[in-house]
Amino acid sequence: MNNSINHKFHHISRAEYQELLAVSRGDAVADYIIDNVSILDLINGGEISGPIVIKGRYIAGVGAEYADAPALQRIDARGATAVPGFIDAHLHIESSMMTPVTFETATLPRGLTTVICDPHEIVNVMGEAGFAWFARCAEQARQNQYLQVSSCVPALEGCDVNGASFTLEQMLAWRDHPQVTGLAEMMDYPGVISGQNALLDKLDAFRHLTLDGHCPGLGGKELNAYIAAGIENCHESYQLEEGRRKLQLGMSLMIREGSAARNLNALAPLINEFNSPQCMLCTDDRNPWEIAHEGHIDALIRRLIEQHNVPLHVAYRVASWSTARHFGLNHLGLLAPGKQADIVLLSDARKVTVQQVLVKGEPIDAQTLQAEESARLAQSAPPYGNTIDRQPVSASDFALQFTPGKRYRVIEVIHNELITHSRSSVYSENGFDRDDVCFIAVLERYGQRLAPACGLLGGFGLNEGALAATVSHDSHNIVVIGRSAEEMALAVNQVIQDGGGLCVVRNGQVQSHLPLPIAGLMSTDTAQSLAEQIDALKAAARECGPLPDEPFIQMAFLSLPVIPALKLTSQGLFDGEKFAFTTLEVTE
């Protein structure tokens, strides 16, 4: 666990120190004082009463001794509880389908003052240009948007076609950027364990920063070796004992609750007073509909308190201080003298009801964020341009021939999990022996002119129609599932025409579609508009059968080879346990 102070992120001049100290001593006037407030003590438990004194970006003092201190402005908290701003320990903003600017508008008023982001979705599509845009957005954001340098582009070498490379030389060019906190999730864990020099070179280059992991279900000697390489955390744990073992071996545990991967219920029982400094919260991938209707990190805190009886100070600790310590962000995570004034005022701490948010010492106004969003997005110079280099397809492109009596591999979906199971199904003249089997195909979209890779999918719940998307981790080729080749072709052609996006087809017609003009991943619409469009897509998808709660996010992970057990990439059917391609027909 990285508990060191990373001085790269704590910029305060000597003049600022002198002004801050003068206010702390009571010799100068504060910029803001928050009165009538109780501060949740994340270290000892309980509460601290008394004002919070702010000078510039920082907290100058806390407690009753400042009751009569002078200030330019006073904020009446009306009896609210103050907690540190929430921190998401690991996410891909692109998966929200919002730009970083829109994401900030949607989440900052909910108390999310800091994010640790890996932009490997857009980097897989357009390389360094995508990372550069995220850095520009982070530089101008009010929200603390930190970046982990994407380590695996593509996720696994030789297993898929993606849009760009991101070389070690390019990665090193960003290592010292003020918003960079470390190396993003090292997904090729077999390569790390086997000591591949190219991967160890990346780890060595970023060893003074934070090294993110990715090792779902890993245990035994392999887990020991992965940690021995220097990997410090994992957000992919989905079983209680798996999480416990990782904590025992010194890993920090990121407890994830996204739109598709929902691991909080499984892992929350691990959290206690002793290990909470090594536990963090993250969303990984969360869509705008859920953010609007349920929340972000605030929703995870609420569930820890209400459903898992986690004490208040521990629940808020894992949502802020634990993550700040892990990433060496010593200026964040506590409401204490010298810390950055990222403050969330709660009218109800148990229900996580946000009353007001301050970030870097300034109150946040949601309407101002919305009003400035368009101009700030333009200022960031988004990388527009069609990233779909694929000709329209026809039904014949998805034709598969099956022999009666033969057995075929089926990717079996587990609702609300990213892992899949591998099963087999026998084909007869009447079809497959289980009626949940539908078709899946992945089409590379980067001009390689490859034929679609086709396979079989079970457990998804698709009874009719087709769904297609260019959000398909991590290479973001076109993924389509359907009951008929004709409707699959129609759905694919719609997302090609849109320059990327999501589509639902049923009864031979496009029922709903959402264009994603930035890299085929993100929209430039407002968060509210996006949430409404997602609602329409989900409603159309539900007409196709009893699908997962988030069908497009669940579908997006069916082509990610670094999560077991069976996946489909643009290169073919991939066994995520043996880390090797396999055949559709079962021959052994």
Swiss-Prot record:
Q: Which Gene3D superfamilies match?
A: Metal-dependent hydrolases (3.20.20.140), Urease, subunit C, domain 1 (2.30.40.10)
What's the family?
Answer: Belongs to the metallo-dependent hydrolases superfamily. Adenine deaminase family.
Listed name of the protein: Adenine deaminase
Against InterPro entries, the record matches this protein to: Adenine_deam (IPR006679), Adenine_deam_C (IPR026912), Amidohydro-rel (IPR006680), Metal-dep_hydrolase_composite (IPR011059), Metal_Hydrolase (IPR032466)
Q: What catalytic reaction does the record list?
A: adenine + H2O + H(+) = hypoxanthine + NH4(+)
A Pfam family the protein falls into: Amidohydro_1
- Molecular function in Gene Ontology: adenine deaminase activity
The cofactors required by this protein are: Mn(2+)
Q: Which GO terms describe its biological process?
A: adenine catabolic process
Provide the assembly information.
Homodimer.
Specify whether Acetylation is a keyword of the entry. no
Q: Which NCBIfam families match?
A: ade, PRK10027.1
- EC number, UniProt record: 3.5.4.2
Instruction: Keywords in alphabetical order, please.
Output: Hydrolase, Manganese
In the UniProt record, does the keyword Transmembrane helix occur? no
